[in-house]
Amino acid sequence: MPAARRRFDPVDHLLALDPGRRGIAAFFQPGGALRAARALARARTVLIVTGFIVADGMPETDGPPGAAVLGRALRQLGARVRYTTDAATLPTLAAALKALGEPADAFAYPDGAQAAREVLARERPTHLVSIERPGRGRGGDYLNMRGVSVAPWNRPLDDMFLLARRRRSSTERTRVSEPRPSQTRPPSVRAGQAPLATISVGDGGNEIGMGNVRGALTRQGTLMARIASVVRVDHLVVAGVSNWGAYGIVAQLGRLTGRPLLHTPADERRLIEACVDAGAVDGITRRRERTVDALDADTHAAIVALLGLSWGDPAPRGERR
């Protein structure tokens, strides 16, 4: 379709808002939320990872609300949904789920070099989703927006995404080679092991999935080149606040399925309050206050209200489920 005839997408325009002035226009992904929604619309088993701990014992308010809202929508569409995060973030995530009346089906990500393999083997997800979760940079460290390491407090949950990508690459190589029935598969690919679909949401460049736009990030200066994640995913959603990106996916799921899946502005206020009461802090101010990325609860509630208006705007032709 010619550019002049492309439909105005209100979800994209809301997600592209940049209240933190991070310059996300340089790496924003138009249509990202819709592509993620298409991938998730018929998901069977979803594992959602979230939680960004900015300092020892200080999980931030961005991430768990988005994970809870997206997980609820996917459960309403029939998927089995579980969550994993660091032990320090579990109370915040559980509080967000409780605020929505959702089961706290979450567990602390285990320690150990084989944790990613063990979790994926046990959970057997068809879709792996990250909402505001640190992804390693080129040097292997996890850095905040100031370039300071947060590795001591954030376990390497991105190992699961790296493993999923390696498995997909191995599977594709196996298919291309078209082995005879008598030939064995490479050790890294098990019989019947379907590739995972991977989706991520981020807002700063240092999260899981930002490897998709690393080239654009590194052109933003030396600091961004240091902190930019190398971890890639199938579908990346960039937003001014990561929670908004998750809400954008839910709004698009609603448009695709014709169902009102998004939470309400009142729910949003309760989510933020519940997370703060459970010990979460604002990721920018590092204060225990009812804000997310230095924006008050009313601002986030307004974004939810605006995204909710898009539900009556049908998805692009041919995209409804």
Regions found by a protein language model. Give the residues of each.
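Short internal beta-strands
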Residues: 79-88
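Positively charged, low-complexity intrinsically disordered leader regions
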Residues: 1-45
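Histidine-anchored nucleotide/phosphate-binding helix
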Residues: 60-78
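C-terminal functional extensions of proteins
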Residues: 205-321
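Conserved mixed alpha/beta catalytic, RNA-binding, or beta-rich assembly cores of soluble enzyme
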Residues: 63-64, 127-128, 133-166, 195-259
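Short, low-complexity, charge-dense intrinsically disordered segments
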Residues: 172-178
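A glycine-rich helix N-cap at a beta->alpha junction
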Residues: 97-120
